[in-house]
Amino acid sequence: MIVWGGVTNGLVSPYVNTGGRYSPFRNAWTAHLTNAPLVGRADHTAVWTGSEMIVWGGVSSTLPAYPAYHNSGARFSPATDSWLSLPAYLSPTARAYHTAIWTGTEMVVWGGYNGSALNTGGRFNPSSGWSGVPVNNAPTARYNHTAVWDGSKMIVWGGTSDGTNGITRGARFLPRTGDWTATAWLGPVILPDRINYCAVWTGTEMLIWGGKKYSYGGNTSYRNDTFGYAPQRITYLYTRP
């Protein structure tokens, strides 16, 4: 497991650009990743390519009222213990609270926030650089959502566009054609909106668990339910206890 970036409890420069590597086999940490060519940040994304970790985006600030959003990134190779900066040319707009997935050949970044919610993104291929993600038929702008890769499509769901109201819709993106398709469901189960939850792809379905429903006006309710989304079963949503 490779960990990088985040926020500490320190009052001076709380955003860090260091990390570490954890070996479950040896139950030990090694290599503190202190030579990253990136400023400290949080709420960025990281994907694993099979040989490298790619870090992109995020936010940092010396004052909460003046956040600095980033559109920079870098690739870390554990084999050589070295970093390589991502090209800036054609990279997406700076953002944080976005999602990123690895398709097997490229990283797809989508959504996020940089003062307002976004419904744009980008695709990074280590061999050829950045290219865009179409906005035609793209889902509603959002952040604090989730995205998974099902082997051929990126599935996006949930999040919020204003920090108050959750979104209960999503979409599937097919990189091969550049097409977006809205998700839908059948049956009596309606998936409650939420943010700050987790989602994984099992090989056959997207599982969504936890999160919270937040309102600036008052109440915050936390979720402990699980929902599954299976595209191959005519997009049927169900719940598990």
Residue map of PLM features:
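Kelch-like beta-propeller repeat domains
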Residues: 1-241
